């Protein structure tokens, strides 16, 4: 695909931002990652609790849940902490539920045993795509947490059934483009977030037109872009997980 339109970043239409996945970013959590999609930076941690929610008690399976938040100055202007306001926004609740659903799609929760894997995604700098970066980084953090369960003999086999990652796509200046940054996201005609597994299955597709409806052909082009982008992200996840721990 050629760069037939001028993206604010100068990237090709099918070009991801620079993606970095840094494991063992903090020392206390069983799994921790700094994930960077260009200037979007998210700390993802995975913590193990030897208990399950009440609705799963005595059912012999585990649970995975996620929380998401942004530092007050992660964006251009400071926002109040949600804890100070005493209430999470609808956006925050939507995103953390999405992260949880995405990761649960590749977990056999019975193999996890009667324990909970808590995923925390904290955005330290936002430039578009925070939810997709969170999912991509959180999977690696969860993988490291599971590795510790295996290493200590607390589980016999991995509950992880596949990889999962996410990316944004959109129609910008009439052209389908991959991995929207803030400037593109705020000006695009269509914005879509796509979550996929390593096997190529779709976990979630969130698509919205902004003023101009998109066609079936445009949707197919966006999904093709997303699929290629997610394949690249999963390759980066695998490369990060192959690196030896210090």
Swiss-Prot record:
Catalytic activity of the protein: tRNA(n+1) + phosphate = tRNA(n) + a ribonucleoside 5'-diphosphate
Binding site for phosphate: 91, 129-131
Entry EC no(s): 2.7.7.56
Root EC class: transferase
Function comment: Phosphorolytic 3'-5' exoribonuclease that plays an important role in tRNA 3'-end maturation. Removes nucleotide residues following the 3'-CCA terminus of tRNAs; can also add nucleotides to the ends of RNA molecules by using nucleoside diphosphates as substrates, but this may not be physiologically important. Probably plays a role in initiation of 16S rRNA degradation (leading to ribosome degradation) during starvation.
Alphabetized NCBIfam families for the sequence: RNasePH (TIGR01966)
Name of the protein described by the UniProt record: Ribonuclease PH
Species whose genome carries this gene: Paraburkholderia phytofirmans (strain DSM 17436 / LMG 22146 / PsJN) (Burkholderia phytofirmans)
